[in-house]
Curated annotation (Swiss-Prot):
InterPro entries: Ribosomal_uS4, Ribosomal_uS4_bac-type, Ribosomal_uS4_CS, Ribosomal_uS4_N, S4_RNA-bd, S4_RNA-bd_sf. Residues 22-42 are annotated as: Disordered. One of the primary rRNA binding proteins, it binds directly to 16S rRNA where it nucleates assembly of the body of the 30S subunit. It comes from the Bacteria. The gene is rpsD. One of its GO terms (biological process) is translation. The lineage of its organism: Bacteria, Bacillati, Bacillota, Bacilli, Bacillales. Coiled coil: none annotated. Belongs to the universal ribosomal protein uS4 family. One of its GO terms (cellular component) is small ribosomal subunit. This is Small ribosomal subunit protein uS4. Gene3D superfamilies: Ribosomal Protein S4 Delta 41, Chain A, domain 1, RNA-binding S4 domain. Residues 92-152 form the S4 RNA-binding domain.
Amino acid sequence: MARYTGPSWKLSRRLGISLSGTGKELEKRPYAPGPHGPGQRKKLSEYGLQLQEKQKLRHMYGVNERQFRNLFDKAAKMAGKHGENFMILLESRLDNIVYRLGLARTRRQARQLVNHGHVLVDGSRVDIPSYQVKPGQTISLREKSQNLSVVKEAVEVNNFVPEYLTFDAEKLEGSLTRLPERSELPAEINEALIVEFYSR
């Protein structure tokens, strides 16, 4: 399944979450798109709830179905809780770390920065958004990339960096100090439903 490239605001309303992270998509119309307005959402079956939760998480991180399933299977081989490990793997993707550091305003922007070769990991260019960042690794930008308008705008408005990251706003450099805990990951996701979906 290809990555969704349509209007993010419409998808956000359909899934009931803000995919941009700003919450603006749901401010005026916090209901699914369509001609009938609020109050028209059908009650979902158990399968429907599981599918919706999977789609919420997949679109939140901007991952296609193949990558999503591969990470899910990888998480199954790790010690600990399957669903929690899965979310930690998603959170440790390079594009997501760039977003969490505040070098991009959205994950989509962060993915473009990585794809276009602007991002360095331990001083070496990495252009693979799905690259798994390990604790202790340093994330920075190429010198000429530090003046990009999208980066400057993102850094100006960013006022929060998760506790599992460190960030130097002067150097535009940060690192993953440890893997995140479940309490630091998106609370609006019920990963148990996703485990149930793939276990059917």
